[in-house]
Amino acid sequence: MIRSILDNDLYKFTMQMAVLELFPNARAEYRFINRGAQSFTNDFVNELRRIINKDISKIALSEDEYIWLKDNCPFFKPSYIEYLKNFRFNPEEVKIVLTEDNELELCIEGPWHSSILWEIVLMSTISELYFTVTDNKGEEISASNANDPENTLMEEYSSFIGDMGKELDAKGCIFSEFGTRRRRGFKLHDKVVEVLHELDSFSGTSNVYFAKKYGVRPIGTIGHEWIMGNSALVGLRNANKFAFDNWVKVYKGDLSIALSDTFGSKPFFQNFSIGLAKIYDGVRHDSGDPIKFADEVIEHYKKLGIDPMKKVLVFSDSLHVSDAVKLKEYCSGRINCSFGIGTTLTNNPDFFSYNPPLNMVIKLHKIDGIPVVKLSDSVEKATGDKDALRVANYIFGRKGLDEQF
């Protein structure tokens, strides 16, 4: 399942380095949320525990990986790469419970700088383990080729993804693969990047392991976690600005795509000053109406006297090919755009319609015992303690203090 410490998304490593530099003593708590109707079993939980305790705990940065990071990721400081060389996952940071209703409860607690790497690793493990247990291969493959189900599945999925990639390429949609967390499995993920990596419009992958394997660019900058964690230290109202300023302190203008929706786009634009707008190469959209947001971003840059055509808007909210094509056409000549496409590539819900991807997240819940929240521009994506969400919605003028979230 997890073959390497680099089998993770780049932004987990970039945020880890920033945490080590600015908040080395902070402690974090994360919670697993299953938004779907899937249930789990004792056998599933026992195998998940075994993988965490026996397999993931042994993963370490190899000498080859160490050299590759030094040669290909200049934004990582030598001291951080040394830290990563000595890093080991600590299974004691992960607590798993199966409830009487067969729901999975998972909590991660530990120093922020170490516990930060668990999220993607656990989500991709949970996903692959779930589909290993529940998939009926007979439904995935052509009956005529049932003698070799795994290879037939790979061939059919390769063709399916290849057609998607060619369509994006033909339409000039610059895109990257963002699908580690909810992938069907490691081998299928590998095949996806293999199929896509030679396309002119394929800009890279968020997965550092596959970026190394296929010689493409590792893609990623800031996740919601960075902004949420910073909010625990300065409060919600100016958390975006504090988080973006801190990112600049660490990376000096590298990796500079600002994530817009942690507390909704309105407070983002209030905090995204002319200084930040000039330093950051662009903005990422991850929830809400993308057309409306594109207009707002373009207008914001123009108000600040910045040419939008010198910036980039990255769309990453549950994208399908048709979405990307539509957005590319809408933004053409107004602002540069690119696309981060995740589950659609690594666990496509149309291809696997009989047993679709898990709708799950693992989100930061507390920093140093202080609850943190994500509000989003899509109500269903909000996460956090109910009382903390209620207060956050009030602070940002979205709801009255006594209104239910």
Curated annotation (Swiss-Prot):
Reactions catalysed: nicotinate + 5-phospho-alpha-D-ribose 1-diphosphate + ATP + H2O = nicotinate beta-D-ribonucleotide + ADP + phosphate + diphosphate
Residue numbers bearing the Phosphohistidine modification: H224
EC number: 6.3.4.21
Pathway(s) annotated for this protein in UniProt: Cofactor biosynthesis; NAD(+) biosynthesis; nicotinate D-ribonucleotide from nicotinate: step 1/1
UniProt modification remark: Transiently phosphorylated on a His residue during the reaction cycle. Phosphorylation strongly increases the affinity for substrates and increases the rate of nicotinate D-ribonucleotide production. Dephosphorylation regenerates the low-affinity form of the enzyme, leading to product release.
Entry GO CC: cytosol
Family: Belongs to the NAPRTase family.
Function according to Swiss-Prot or TrEMBL: Catalyzes the synthesis of beta-nicotinate D-ribonucleotide from nicotinate and 5-phospho-D-ribose 1-phosphate at the expense of ATP.
Protein name: Nicotinate phosphoribosyltransferase
Source organism (scientific name): Methanococcoides burtonii (strain DSM 6242 / NBRC 107633 / OCM 468 / ACE-M)
Gene that specifies this protein: pncB
